[in-house]
Amino acid sequence: MLSHLVVGQGLYYGDSIFYAVCFLLLMWIIKVLAWKPVTKMMQDRADKISNDIDSAEKSRNDAAELVQKRQAALASSRSEAQTIVNDAKANGQQQREQIVTQAQADVQTLKQNAQKDIEQERQDALSNARNYVADLSIEIASKIIQRELKADDQKALIDSYIEGLGKQHES
């Protein structure tokens, strides 16, 4: 490898040793001054990349966990909303049935009250008619007793009272 130098110009071992010592000295200076900062910088960069990867992985896991929580919350909200809707429907149905039942009970009560009122009015009308007929009979009897009537007079008297009864009843 160095044979071409030896033939034509000669190899100076002193220069070679000097260059080798300078090279080794330069390597040592680079190691002391530059190598440690460069390796430290490279290590710091590797640590930062590793931390960034770990942070990204953690963020991805957190995001996935958050997505799962949101999906669970959404499912829970949907379930709760469905429960609320079902409860509202059931309550509405129950209230409707209660209203219908109450209305039927009110109608039945009104019907019974109307029947009682009708029966009372009928009883009052019958009582009034009895009283009127009794009064009329007493009046007829008293007039008959006061005078003795012939058959034609008696018939005319009864007809006049019946006619008077019809007029009073109409008014």
Swiss-Prot record:
One of its GO terms (cellular component) is plasma membrane. InterPro entries: ATP_synth_B-like_membr_sf (IPR028987), ATP_synth_b/b'su_bac/chlpt (IPR002146), ATP_synth_F0_bsu_bac (IPR005864), ATP_synthase_B_chain (IPR050059). SUPFAM superfamilies: F1F0 ATP synthase subunit B, membrane domain. CDD domains: ATP-synt_Fo_b. The keyword Transferase does not apply. GO terms for molecular function: proton-transporting ATP synthase activity, rotational mechanism; proton-transporting ATPase activity, rotational mechanism. It is a single-pass membrane protein. The chain crosses the membrane at residues 10-30. The keyword Transmembrane helix applies. It comes from the Bacteria. Its main location: membrane. It is found in: Cell membrane. Pfam families: ATP-synt_B. Keywords: ATP synthesis, Cell membrane, CF(0), Hydrogen ion transport, Ion transport, Membrane, Transmembrane, Transmembrane helix, Transport. F-type ATPases have 2 components, F(1) - the catalytic core - and F(0) - the membrane proton channel. F(1) has five subunits: alpha(3), beta(3), gamma(1), delta(1), epsilon(1). F(0) has three main subunits: a(1), b(2) and c(10-14). The alpha and beta chains form an alternating ring which encloses part of the gamma chain. F(1) is attached to F(0) by a central stalk formed by the gamma and epsilon chains, while a peripheral stalk is formed by the delta and b chains. NCBIfam families: ATP_synt_b (TIGR01144). Belongs to the ATPase B chain family. F(1)F(0) ATP synthase produces ATP from ADP in the presence of a proton or sodium gradient. F-type ATPases consist of two structural domains, F(1) containing the extramembraneous catalytic core and F(0) containing the membrane proton channel, linked together by a central stalk and a peripheral stalk. During catalysis, ATP synthesis in the catalytic domain of F(1) is coupled via a rotary mechanism of the central stalk subunits to proton translocation. This is ATP synthase subunit b. The lineage of its organism: Bacteria, Bacillati, Bacillota, Bacilli, Lactobacillales. The gene is atpF.
